[in-house]
Design a protein with these regions (language model features):
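Hydrophobic beta-strand residues in large extracellular and virion-surface proteins
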Residues: 7, 11, 18, 63-65, ...
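Sterically constrained small-residue positions within well-ordered secondary structures
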Residues: 30, 54, 99-101
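Residues that cap or initiate secondary-structure elements
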Residues: 43-45, 69-71, 114-118
């Protein structure tokens, strides 16, 4: 069963730079060159009407790919994400140009990933 942890591990295995929420560039550790990925965990909620007895949580997980252009290289990376990371979950995909960063963003949103709640 895919969980947010499993999806993050799969994304890390692609070999691109990846971080949670945002890269915080410093002089000693600058933001990596494009392409890179950012993952987010925007929401978690109890699952089911009997959420206490079944002890389940439903997480949302988002992966953002940032590339220089919306070109063949970006499409190859998106194909790898879809085939190697997201192959067993439903997702919504958005592609947009980010003017302020002079790059393209592909965002994948996955909702309702079930996991056992921590006790």
């Amino acid at each position: 069963m895919a969980t947010a942890v499993v999806l993050t591990e799969r994304a890390e295995s692609l070999g691109l730079p990846i971080t949670k929420n945002a890269f915080e560039g410093t002089l000693e550790n600058p933001v990596p060159p494009l392409p890179y990925m950012v993952y987010l965990l925007p929401r978690e909620a109890t699952a089911g009407a009997d959420s206490r007895p079944n002890n389940l949580m439903a997480d949302d997980w988002q992966l953002e790919l940032y590339t220089v252009a919306d070109d063949e290289t970006a499409e190859e990376i998106r194909t790898r994400i879809e085939n190697e990371v997201l192959h067993d979950v439903d997702y919504v995909k958005f592609v947009a140009h980010v003017d302020s960063e002079e790059c393209f963003q592909t965002a994948y949103e996955v909702t309702g990933l079930l996991r056992k709640a921590r006790k």
